[in-house]
Amino acid sequence: MSTSVAAIVSPMVVVAEDSRDTRQMLKRAFELKGYRVLEAQNGKEAVDLTRTFKPNLILVDLNMPELDGLETIRYVRGMKGTQDPVPIVAMTAFHVYGMEQAALEAGCNEYLIKPFDLDDLDKKLKGLGFIV
């Protein structure tokens, strides 16, 4: 399959995570499954990438600089022209009481506590009807 055809048919994922190591791990995992991955180091970059590329899935860390994950989710949910609605998985290493509820109320579809196993992510994505 040519690169241009692969780019048309391969689902696109935005990984919004300020930890380079976590971004790279998620990028490799998705690329091995044939997904195109766009990386964002903060919420502002994630919003810009989402606006420009209209991804099929967004993974967003809740604790990021410039625009935190909750605000990123709210902003994406308010955008016109994104995949209707693009699935969003919120991730956090700083789980506190009420955080999951706040993320769901902001508009995420799933919630993961870091560190997590990639099988846990796969289960969440399958539950959303996303093929992994």
Model-derived segments and spans:
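Charged docking surfaces used in two-component/phosphorelay signaling
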Residues: 24-32
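Short hydrophobic/Thr-rich beta-strand motif most characteristic of the beta2 strand and flanking loop
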Residues: 34-41, 49
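Active-site beta3 strand of CheY-like receiver
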Residues: 53-59
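Receiver (REC) domain active-site loop signature in two-component systems and cognate sites
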Residues: 64
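Conserved acidic carboxylate
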Residues: 17
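Non-catalytic signal-transmission and effector/linker regions of two-component phosphorelay proteins
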Residues: 1-14, 119-132
